[in-house]
Amino acid sequence: MFTQKSFEIFSIDGLEARMAEIRSEIQPVFSEIGQKLLTELSAKISNQEFYFHIAQHRRRTANAPENTWSAISTKARGYKMEAHFQLGIWEDYVFIYLSMIDQPKKQKEYAELLTNLSVEKMLTEDFIISKDHTKAEVFPLSAFSEAAERLGKVKKSELEIGRLWPKERFDGKEDSKILAEMLETIDQLLPIYQKLMEV
């Protein structure tokens, strides 16, 4: 599980130095939790194969990443081309999202579906949304409808929906509770995900 050291990594200066710590400290946690999320997904959607990915930030040449993430998708060679699940970390929180980022192939179809779904009624109010995977800012679930409409109208718009866990909770005392909440987050998002995969 993540620890306070996981969050301190984002204070390290320099691309190589920060990436070295991300690889040694954060990516093994992604793999550990990711396998549990993968098992949960595979049990709930048994007729679909899922693949686990870890962001490598290979295109970066100068700036160290301000966050990092892993993803679960139905594609072996990538994840951004479709709606997918993400487990990631910023300097002050960990998140799990159902993500539509970087102009997925069915962006307009996703937007149309989500605009007509009563998503706010399908999820508990502690769920939040992100409109840009490169920024730490999040918005309440009440902002979902507007963001879903924007996904259909603005080519470069993004939409992620899920939960976050503030860094203060990662003191080693709540690890099993946090993991249970993560699995439950996937379960709550599954009905939405399954509808997205049908479009």
UniProtKB/Swiss-Prot annotation:
Transmembrane segments: none annotated. HAMAP family: UPF0637. InterPro entries: UPF0637, UPF0637_domain_sf. This is UPF0637 protein llmg_1936. Pfam families: DUF1054. It comes from the Bacteria. It comes from Lactococcus lactis subsp. cremoris (strain MG1363). Belongs to the UPF0637 family.
